[in-house]
UniProtKB/Swiss-Prot annotation:
GO terms for molecular function: hydrolase activity; lipoprotein lipase activity; metal ion binding; monoacylglycerol lipase activity. It is found in: Cell membrane; Cell projection, Dendritic spine membrane; Postsynaptic density membrane; Early endosome membrane. Keywords: Calcium, Cell membrane, Cell projection, Endosome, Glycoprotein, Hydrolase, Lipid degradation, Lipid metabolism, Membrane, Metal-binding, Phosphoprotein, Postsynaptic cell membrane, Synapse, Transmembrane, Transmembrane helix. The chain crosses the membrane at residues 23-43, 61-81, 102-122, 137-157. GO terms for biological process: arachidonate metabolic process; cannabinoid biosynthetic process; diacylglycerol catabolic process; endocannabinoid signaling pathway; monoacylglycerol biosynthetic process; neuroblast proliferation; neurogenesis; regulation of neuroinflammatory response. The modification Phosphothreonine is found at T1025. It comes from the Eukaryota. Glycans are attached at N133. This is Diacylglycerol lipase-alpha. The lineage of its organism: Eukaryota, Metazoa, Chordata, Craniata, Vertebrata. Its cofactor is Ca(2+). Belongs to the AB hydrolase superfamily. Lipase family. Inhibited by 1,2,3-triazole urea covalent inhibitors KT172, DH376 and DO34. Inhibited by p-hydroxy-mercuri-benzoate and HgCl(2), but not to PMSF. Also inhibited by RHC80267. Diacylglycerol lipase activity is inhibited by the phosphorylation of Ser-784 and Ser-810 by CAMK2A.
Length: 1044
């Protein structure tokens, strides 16, 4: 809330900040009230002892003071818990209660003095031990409370409080010259106050001219940032809590919408179909990423002994102590003669820590040439090393580690880069521009780079490349230093880890992409803050505070894990409804524009390491580790501060190092994005979730031939997609899905004796129940995607009712041929509308299985009636019975799909109807999809005289059928991107429901034994054809549905 006004002065504390202090004092005074009451009325005192009589009189008076304090503190607690952050009207009487409490405090002060007098007179002579101890406790407690109140008053004292009250009173009446003068005095007073605070914060440092200038610039920056804002520090804390809740609510609302391209949020960043992932399967991309991880070790070593001990708190101290000689053995050589160390401590701990860091990482080929530990404002420590393994000279700049570094960070005005020969104006962060100029000057004066490149001419150091690295402040300084050194070293490369957001202007940022690679981890705060970003953050903070109607204590307490979360203020709350109660600010104060600052952005090409957030487990269950992914970030996308408990933790250098390594670990474990998404997302499609289908090529087993319908023998006709699916197994791990396996002859024969549709229904129903039990919370996970992989169906736009169960059983479609090898396909969850998708697939399976069973025995019945070598006797007998029934003119039972003169009947089988109802009961929650009978009529011609191969006649039926293929739920959606629309470098290929070849073309998955008309009924049953298998044109393919 606005600062409370007491004694006609504004204080840096709000009336709703007094809840906890009042509760603490109330409990303390209640405890002493009980103790003193027991001592006074429960004990018998000697009437002849003067000390006892004085104690009784003093105690009774103090009981009255304690009772008054308890009443006043209860009133303070009650008033502080009323109203909202900016709704101060219910707390208007707080100042009068404080006047009463301060008057009681004065009386307490008098009684504390009396207690000291009593102790000096009677403490040694009084024989009543209880009286002496109680009096001593009361006096000590009183003085502790009094001193605490005095310290608190000094902390919340605002030097500009009187001017602020006058300015507010003047603005209420009119705007005139007096208002301008008061505002000017207020800004100057606030700048002076901030400067004094900075000097107190850096009281142990020696002040130089540059440091004094930094004090002034930062003080004016803070004064301007907080000008006209009548808020207190606790309001900022509550605002951060509310802002985090609002950001999370907005992300959930975006995911629930159906008319946007955002698929998920990873580390607060939106993931769309255009998101570019690092293609780690590409050798060049993998080499580049490993190079980024490698040089992070150099940036980490620049922090010296503090970071070394932080990473290795146990054995690190022993390692340093063994190498340090300190001042006891100055003659002991610790470094090579060619190593220059500047301003290290007496033990040389920083230089030793840098060397130990490389030794611990087995980087023995790294030689330290120069180490500067000099630390001042605009003068950042750095070191230069020669890496003989990589044939590079490395300049590593330290990040923020001292208060002086913080001053350099806070000097964030735009400064012109001292680089000539370019078009436009290149601007950079002032503090880091000055630091880069200092390092460049130091390198030239000490001829450090000449020493490095001439370190070992026999090993070719003269032709080594130059690398500049840094983290945080060092990252920004390294990027700007690269601008300064690039004219002399055109092949220079820079790696900036967690660089500041307000670093380079747009022109300079675009140019830096040629030689700078930046790394950002998760929700790191630093790459998202600059002057322009802070202005937006300021507006968001004020807006969320203005909309809040909850008490501050409830908001802050609700942010803890042990207390239920506070309610998020609704956006529909009319701000004007409380305008009369918010007289603390002028109407234009919330919309004032800060001084126009040039937008600055992070440098180079940004690798954004993001990760998912697994659902929190109970205390007895093991927490699932998050999965890390690397994507290419947009420099202009880091324009909003994402409030999170991890926003500071993910900026630490060793945490960044761990994040980079976890991307490689997840990739090596095969945790790819699409398959992880298949486990947790709510509406994946069949092909998009399995871009790399597993093909297991196994020889035919010795023994009886497999029955019809249990194995898939793909024809040898060469297709255009055969080159990408010829591997025995994909590089991707299909975790969460059972692998395709070859049935044994015995199991195959037993399965063949059952009705294929019944086998399908039983197996699929059991598999579906197990799959629904294993479903996890819907949270997007994704990793490295290549050009051939698709994320189209990775759709996070879901409603709350579909977050637990959406998907349908995997139907295993196989074809059988006579010769060749066997390939098994393990499909995944079908398309977005599970009820419709599975019923269409089931219908096609049922229709074609009956069709294949009834049409194939015709040749055998017309021939000799013998059993062909390719078919088992049982299958031949079934075919004979079917053929005989057909010849005899028998009528098929009602509910079966029988073949009459080459035409299908118009009603599905009972098994199909039963399973369709089961699917509807699970998935058809919204009742928007077509009914099963409608689908059946759409797949099977209504007229008994029409030929089966003709398909739908009217254009409307054709349109419905096509939309049933591509849009299963028949609901209009935004235009979809297909295979050719994604950029090759994006790492994601998009398709409606088809897999892609390595060239980005749609793969032809039509079985060669079926006609184009028959494929209309089998559009959901997709297979792919490897190279080298041909089809016999004279034989009819058998299509049987098999479920595992």
């Amino acid at each position: 809330m606005p600062g409370i006004v007491v004694f006609r002065r504004r204080w840096s504390v709000g009336s709703d900040d007094l809840v906890l202090p009042a509760i603490f004092l109330f409990l303390l005074h209640t405890t002493w009230f009980v103790i003193l009451s027991v001592v006074l009325f429960g004990l018998v005192y000697n009437p002849h002892e003067a000390c006892s009589l004085n104690l009784v009189d003093h105690g009774r008076g103090y009981l009255g003071i304690l009772l008054s304090c308890m009443i006043a503190e209860m009133a303070i607690i009650w008033l502080s818990m009323r109203g909202g952050i900016l709704y101060t009207e219910p707390r208007d009487s707080m100042q009068y209660v404080l006047y009463v409490r301060l008057a009681i405090l004065v009386i307490e002060f008098i009684y504390a003095i009396v207690g000291i007098v009593w102790l000096t007179q009677y403490y040694t002579s009084c024989n009543d031990l209880t009286a002496k101890n109680v009096t001593l406790g009361m006096v000590v407690c009183n003085w502790v409370v009094i001193l605490s109140v005095c310290i608190t008053v000094l902390c919340v004292f605002d030097p500009t409080g009187r001017t602020f009250v006058k300015l507010r009173a003047t603005k209420r009446r009119q705007r005139n010259l007096r208002t301008y003068n008061l505002r000017h005095r207020l800004e100057e007073g606030q700048a002076t106050s901030w400067s004094r605070r900075l000097k107190v914060f850096l009281c142990c440092t020696r002040t130089k001219d540059s440091q004094s200038d930094a004090y002034s610039e930062i003080a004016y920056l803070f004064a301007e940032f907080f000008r006209d804002l009548d808020i207190v520090p606790s309001d900022i804390i509550a605002g951060l809590v509310l802002l985090r809740q609002r950001q999370r609510a907005k992300r959930n609302a975006v995911l629930d919408e159906a008319n946007n391209d955002i698929l998920a949020f990873l580390s607060g960043m939106p993931v769309t179909r255009n998101t570019k992932y690092l293609d780690l399967k590409n050798s060049h991309e993998m080499l580049r990423y490993k190079e980024v991880c490698y040089y992070m070790l150099f940036a980490l070593a620049a922090y010296g002994w503090p970071m070394y001990l932080m990473r290795k708190p146990t054995c690190g101290l022993c390692q340093l102590a063994r190498s340090c000689s300190c001042c006891l053995c100055p003659a002991r050589p610790r470094f090579a003669p060619g190593v220059t160390i500047e301003e290290d401590n007496c033990c040389g701990c920083n230089a030793i820590a840098i060397r130990r860091h490389f030794l611990d990482e087995n980087m023995t080929a790294v030689d330290i040439v120069y180490t500067s530990c000099h630390d001042a404002v605009y003068e950042t420590p750095f070191y230069v090393a020669v890496d003989h393994d990589k044939k590079k000279v490395v300049i590593s700049i330290r990040g923020t580690l001292s208060p002086k570094d913080a001053l350099t960070d806070l000097t964030g005005d735009a400064e012109r880069l001292p680089v000539e020969g370019h078009r436009g104006t290149w601007l950079g962060h002032k503090g880091m521009v000055l630091s880069a100029e200092y390092i460049k000057k130091k390198l030239e004066q000490e001829m450090v780079l000449s020493q490095a490149f001439g370190r070992d001419l026999g090993r070719g150091t003269k032709h080594y490349g130059l690398i500049v690295v840094g983290h945080s402040l060092g990252a920004g300084t390294a990027a700007i230093l690269s601008f300064l050194l690039r004219p002399q070293y055109p092949t220079l490369k820079c790696f900036a880890y967690s660089p500041p957001g307000g670093l380079l202007s747009e022109d300079a940022m675009e140019y830096s992409k040629e030689f700078v690679t930046a790394v950002v981890l998760g929700k790191d705060l630093v790459p998202r803050i600059g002057l322009s970003q802070l202005e937006g953050f300021r507006r968001q903070l004020l807006d969320v505070l203005q909309r809040s109607t909850k008490p501050k204590w409830r908001i802050i307490v609700g942010a803890t894990k042990c207390i239920p979360k506070s309610e998020l203020p609704e956006d529909q709350v009319e701000v004007t409804a409380l305008a009369s109660t918010r007289l603390w600010t002028h109407p234009s104060d919330l919309t004032i524009a800060l001084s126009a600052s040039t937008p600055l952005y992070p440098p180079g090409r940004i690798i954004h390491v993001v990760h998912n957030h697994p659902a929190e487990q109970c205390c007895c269950c093991e927490q699932e580790e998050p999965t890390y992914f690397a994507i290419w970030g947009d420099n202009k996308a880091f324009n909003e501060v994402i409030i999170s408990p991890a926003m500071l933790h993910e900026h630490l250098p060793y945490v960044v190092m761990e994040g980079l390594n976890k991307v490689l670990e997840n990739y090596n474990k095969g945790k790819t994005a699409l398959l992880s998404a298949a486990k947790v997302m709510v509406s994946p499609t069949e092909v998009d979730l399995t871009p790399e289908l597993i093909f297991q090529q196994q020889p035919l087993p010795t023994g009886p031939p497999l029955p019809t319908g249990l194995a898939l023998e793909l024809p040898a006709t060469e297709h255009r997609n055969s080159s990408v699916r010829s591997k025995s197994q994909s590089e991707m791990s299909l975790e969460g899905f059972s692998e395709g396996r070859l049935l044994s002859p015995v199991a195959a024969a037993s399965a063949a004796r059952q009705d294929p549709v019944e086998l399908l229904l039983l197996s699929t129903q059991e598999r579906l129940a197990a799959e629904l039990q294993s479903r996890r919370a819907p949270l997007a996970t994704m990793e490295s995607l290549s050009d051939t992989e698709s994320l189209y169906s990775f759709d996070s736009r879901r409603s709350s009712g579909f977050r637990s169960i959406r998907g349908s059983p995997s139907l295993h479609a196989v074809l059988e041929r006579d010769e060749g090898h066997l390939f098994y396909i393990d499909p995944a969850i079908p398309e977005e509308n599970p009820s419709l998708s599975s019923r269409t697939e089931l219908l096609a399976a049922d229709s074609l299985s009956k069709h294949s069973q009834d049409t194939q025995p015709l040749e055998a019945a017309l021939g000799s009636g013998g059993v062909t070598p390719e078919r088992p006797p049982s299958a031949a007998n079934d075919e004979e019975e079917a053929a005989g029934g057909s010849e005899g003119g028998g009528v098929a039972p009602r509910g079966e799909l029988a073949l009459h003169n080459g035409r299908l009947g118009d009603s599905p089988s009972p098994q199909v109807l039963e399973f369709a109802e089961f699917i509807d009961s699970l998935f058809n929650l919204d009742s928007k999809s077509s009914s099963f009978q409608d689908l059946y009529c759409m797949m099977v011609p209504e007229s008994p005289t029409s030929d089966y191969t003709e398909g739908p006649k009217s254009p409307s039926q054709q349109e419905i059928l096509l939309r049933a293929q591509f849009e299963p739920n028949l609901v209009p959606k935004p235009p979809r991107l297909f295979a050719g629309s994604a950029e090759p470098s994006s790492g994601i290929s998009l398709s409606p429901s088809f897999p892609l070849s390595s060239s980005g073309e749609l793969m032809d998955l039509t079985p060669t034994g079926l006609s184009s008309q028959e494929c209309l009924a089998t559009d959901k049953i997709r297979t792919s054809t490897p190279t080298g298998h041909g089809a016999s044109p004279t034989k009819q393919d058998d299509l049987v549905i098999s479920a595992r």
